[in-house]
């Protein structure tokens, strides 16, 4: 009985968290049901090599990259080096 109740509560929590995030993405981000967790970042310029796996969460919009691993999404031009 405990296992079935625990499983039911767990499924409700997962479903709630999954659908609650769709409308609450930070600026310059959008929700993706199956996004690649290896996003471009300013500090590396390219995504790292990793296995493709679906992640359902907010990702940077087209033309934006992460400032840092868990940072905000900024325009790609923001990361380009300044030449003097």
UniProtKB/Swiss-Prot annotation:
Q: Which GO terms describe its molecular function?
A: IgE binding; serine-type endopeptidase inhibitor activity
Give the residues annotated as coiled coil: none
Q: What protein name applies here? A: Chymotrypsin inhibitor Ani s 6
**Where does the UniProt annotation place the signal sequence?**
1-22
Q: Which SUPFAM superfamilies match?
A: Serine protease inhibitors
Domain (TIL) spans 25-79
Q: Where in the cell is it found?
A: Secreted
**Record organism:** Anisakis simplex (Herring worm)
Its job: Inhibits alpha-chymotrypsin, but not trypsin.
**Keyword Transmembrane appears in the UniProt entry:** no
Q: Just give the chief location class.
A: secreted
Q: List the disulfide bonds.
A: 25-58, 34-54, 38-50, 42-79, 60-73
């Amino acid at each position: 009985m405990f296992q079935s109740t625990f499983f039911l509560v767990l499924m409700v929590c997962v479903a709630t968290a999954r659908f609650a995030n769709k409308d609450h993405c930070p600026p310059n981000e959008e929700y993706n049901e199956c996004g690649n967790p290896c996003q471009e970042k300013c500090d590396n310029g390219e995504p790292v090599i990793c296995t493709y796996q679906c992640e359902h969460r907010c990702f940077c919009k087209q033309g934006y990259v992460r400032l840092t691993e868990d940072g905000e999404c900024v325009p790609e031009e923001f990361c380009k080096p300044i030449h003097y």
